[in-house]
A protein has these predicted regions:
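C-terminal transmembrane helix-loop-helix hairpin of multi-pass membrane proteins
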Residues: 139-143, 155-158, 163-181, 207-212, ...
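Soluble N-terminal domains of membrane-associated systems
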Residues: 1-49
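Hydrophobic alpha-helical segments embedded in the membrane of multi-pass proteins
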Residues: 64-68, 89-97, 118-119, 214-221, ...
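Core alpha-helical transmembrane segments of integral membrane proteins
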Residues: 56-155, 227-228, 232
Length: 351
């Protein structure tokens, strides 16, 4: 018995996607088991039932959310043209299909990020060369935005700041490897097209009008609700969280005056979302992640990290270091905002 007691078994679980509906169901099962309404055997059975595979409708919705997210990011942050928006949305759907195929194929999943980057860059260059000129970098960045590990970088810094050093460093390493794979895919596709004589025509088309920010924000909020598999009853909450987080970040940047606008805006957005998530968890008795996870998706600096690694591989060391410092600043600002949000309103539990 002493030998058994001194034996430790470590099981490695593959990182899964965020599924807010199943998270809420698991939270409800735990609450009912603690309250004595469910015995352990029945609770365990219900938890096992949560591992059911996605339905055909859920898979189609997930693919569509990739396209909607890419198109909305192209309009909301990059202020590209209508053509760039449409092409980014189509490429986003292609990446959604690749991601769906990789979910059930472990060998494909290892290289899915690089394959997605190759596909996105190749399609953008071919369309720009033979159909209509595009802003290549904007289209590729918008189409890959869901794969860029901004959320992983944020969670890594948050865990490190909470003294969870092992898990934080592991997340940081995973996020950096994803950035390297995405950057490698874009550079490889660019060089491959150049080898075949396919040259993109860079041409600045008229940008989208300013009023498109608001419908793009609503479309992004709906896309995130689908992407994070939120239950229909939680869709209004998710949409409000995304809209409030974005508007708070923009407002915080406008009132910063002499301070850097981006870090101040991200801090204000993180602070408000962190407090809102804890208030929602306390009064609705549901996980605060329903607000926190989709709400900060527009705040995480994943695109900055992608650009930093891209500049580094292009041997533009100065610009890469400058962008890398901006990445660190934004990460610290966002994590600081979330921590102060927890300080204002204490969380109900870790979810």
């Amino acid at each position: 018995e002493e030998g058994v007691a001194q034996t430790t078994q470590v099981m490695r679980l593959a990182p899964g996607e965020v599924n807010l509906e199943r998270l809420c169901q698991a939270d409800d099962i735990a609450d009912r088991a603690i309250a004595g309404e469910l015995d352990l055997r029945e609770g365990f059975r219900r938890l096992r039932d949560l591992g059911r595979p996605d339905t055909r409708r859920e898979k189609i919705g997930s693919i569509a959310s990739y396209g909607l997210s890419a198109a909305s990011i192209a309009a909301l942050f990059l202020h590209s043209s209508w053509v760039d928006l449409v092409v980014a949305g189509v490429i986003g759907v292609i990446i959604g299909c690749i991601t769906l195929l990789a979910a059930s194929r472990p060998r494909l999943a290892v290289a899915s990020d690089a394959i997605s980057a190759v596909a996105a860059t190749t399609v953008a260059i071919v369309v720009s060369a033979f159909v209509v000129p595009l802003a290549i970098k904007s289209v590729v960045l918008a189409s890959l935005i869901i794969l860029v590990p901004g959320m992983s970088l944020t969670n890594a810094v948050r865990e490190i700041s909470s003294q969870h050093l092992v898990s934080g460093m592991a997340r940081m390493g995973g996020a950096m490897s994803t950035l390297l794979k995405l950057t490698f895919g874009t550079i490889a596709a660019t060089q491959l097209c150049a080898a075949f004589g396919i040259r993109a025509r860079e041409f600045a088309l008229p940008p989208l009008p300013g009023w498109t920010d608001y419908p793009a924000l609503l479309i992004a909020a709906v896309a995130f609700a689908i992407l994070f598999r939120a239950a229909r009853r939680d869709w209004p909450v998710v949409i409000v969280a995304v809209v409030v987080g974005f508007l708070a970040t923009r407002w915080g940047g406008e009132i910063s005056e002499s301070l850097p606008s981006a870090p101040v805006g991200v801090f204000v957005g993180g602070l408000l979302l962190g407090a809102m998530a804890n208030v929602y968890a306390r009064f609705a008795h549901r996980p605060g992640a329903v607000i926190r996870e989709p709400g900060i998706l527009l705040l995480v600096p994943g695109s900055v990290g992608f650009r930093s690694v891209s500049f580094l591989l292009e041997r533009d060391t100065s610009l890469s270091m400058d962008t890398g410092l901006l990445l660190v600043t934004l990460l610290v600002s966002l994590v600081g905002g979330l921590m102060f949000g927890d300080l204002l309103v204490s969380p109900r539990r870790s979810l």
